[in-house]
Design a protein with these regions (language model features):
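Glycine-rich loop/linker segments at domain edges
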Residues: 49-53, 57, 122-161, 167, ...
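C-terminal catalytic domains of large/alpha subunits in multi-subunit enzymes
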Residues: 37-38, 193-198, 228-233, 262-263, ...
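Helix-loop-helix junctions that connect adjacent transmembrane helices in secondary transporters/permeases
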Residues: 110-192, 356-396
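Extended active-site and interfacial segments that coordinate phosphate-rich ligands
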Residues: 5, 90-103, 179-181, 186, ...
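General beta-strand structural signal in soluble alpha/beta enzymes
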Residues: 33-38, 69, 142-146, 174-176, ...
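Glycine-rich and small/hydrophobic secondary-structure elements
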Residues: 52-85, 210-262, 318-343, 366-388
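Flexible, low-hydrophobicity surface segments
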Residues: 1-119, 228
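Acidic, glycine-rich active-site loops and adjacent beta-strand->loop/helix elements
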Residues: 40-41, 178-181, 205-209, 237-247, ...
Length: 396
């Protein structure tokens, strides 16, 4: 007696749902119900919450009447089979009140999409590592910058969830591929006002995640409808839905300013990073701050100043992504090294060998040893195996 769901997603980037007309859908044989932002709970949650005492903002509902991006969840149709659910979903008509929106860094920083009382910058963070120097006399300044676009995980298996509610036992069981059974239980119990002991989450075998299934989008929907209908409910996202309606790696704008001695030794570096969290903040504060801990693990940096900010545009939501900012940090740092090598007229590998961290060095942020990292050995071996010096000589 499984019920199948088809989602109703926002067709506008920013605004309010004023009315949902579901009469045609409900008249279709085999349709069990149309659940949406105007006839279900208005309790809020965070898709990033992993336990009840996490300091994260509860910004979203199971179905949102205040929509913040194209693809935001506004409702779901439950039916006897997937084909009927999809057919009924196409019959639902939604009225919106549209608001100004922003999809890029500049418009968002200017507050184009801000409501009265809101600020464009949602969070700022600063960190200093090492002893601040007197100045930059005798040092050569090198500036580099880059923008990194959103990136989707593209897991083999898209997002899927099955929820089953036993009204006699008041027991809700959720089956889904996920990275935190306790996080899902915490969120669902709070939303449906159930004791956590009455919510059971079964982690299914995952067809890939890479962070995509560390946050909760389908589970609240399936749980709510299963409890309403009192039968098993299945929700499967298409590839298009997974790419636009779950999480992506957030877009970043990163600037680095390094100061070097004439022989190429890095003495100071200043980072300025902007992370676009997309429509909801989620893990953005933690994610951009995690980046601050990465530079001193790869390079010997006597002094680092890190400044970051988080903005929220009307775009797909940023979330966990494999390596949690290490790839972004590597890109901006290696771009900085290439720019420095060009300005100082040095070989790119030679410059790196002069500055990379060595086994046993101290991570200046954590004050812990880096152990057996051997970056210098890897560079030297690569230089030899790829005949780097020969290639450079031929290029000249």
């Amino acid at each position: 007696n499984m019920a199948y769901l088809c989602m109703l997603h926002s067709k506008i980037p920013h605004g309010y749902v004023k009315a949902v007309h579901a009469e045609k859908a409900l008249a279709l044989p085999g349709v069990y119900g149309v659940y949406h932002c105007l006839n279900t709970t208005d309790r809020k949650y965070s898709h990033y919450r992993a336990n009840f005492d996490m300091n994260v903002a509860d910004e979203e509902r199971v179905f949102n009447n205040y929509v913040r991006f194209i693809g935001d969840k506004i409702g779901a149709v439950a039916a006897c089979d997937q084909e009927t659910a999809e057919k009924a979903a196409r019959l639902v008509e939604v009225e919106y009140e549209e608001l100004p929106f922003s999809i890029g860094f500049d418009d968002t920083l200017e507050g184009k999409n801000c409501l009265p009382g809101e600020t464009a910058i949602k969070d700022e963070y600063e960190l200093e590592v090492g002893e601040k120097p007197e100045g930059t006399n005798g040092l050569i300044e090198v500036c580099s910058s880059m923008e990194i676009p959103r990136l989707h995980h593209a897991t083999m298996e898209t997002h899927v969830c099955v929820a089953d509610y036993d009204s006699y036992e008041n027991m809700l069981t959720i089956y889904c591929p996920n990275q935190s059974v306790h996080g899902i239980r915490t969120v669902i119990a709070g939303l449906l006002q159930m004791p956590e002991s009455r919510v059971r989450v079964v982690k299914a075998t995952m067809g890939g995640s890479f962070g995509a299934k560390q946050e909760w989008f389908l589970e609240p929907v399936a749980a709510l409808v299963a409890k309403e209908l009192g039968c098993p409910v299945k929700l499967v996202y298409s590839r298009a839905e997974a790419m636009t309606c779950t999480v992506v790696r957030g877009a970043m704008r990163m600037n680095a300013r390094g100061y070097y001695t004439p022989d190429g030794t890095l003495k100071q570096i200043y980072y300025d990073v902007t992370l676009d969290a997309g429509a909801y903040i989620g893990n953005a504060y933690d994610y951009v701050r995690a980046l601050a801990g990465k530079p001193t693990r790869g390079y010997r940096i006597p002094y680092m100043h890190y400044h970051s900010r988080v903005i929220s545009s009307n775009t797909p939501v940023s979330g966990a992504f494999r390596s949690w900012s290490a790839a972004e940090e590597a890109l901006v740092m290696e771009r900085q090294m290439d720019a420095a090598a060009e300005k100082l007229h040095m070989d790119r590998i030679a410059l790196r060998l002069k500055n990379v961290a060595h086994s046993g060095d101290e991570d200046k942020k954590l004050h812990l040893p880096l152990e057996d990292i051997r970056i210098d050995d890897a560079l030297s071996m690569g230089r030899e195996k790829f005949e780097w010096d020969k290639l450079i000589a031929e290029d000249r």
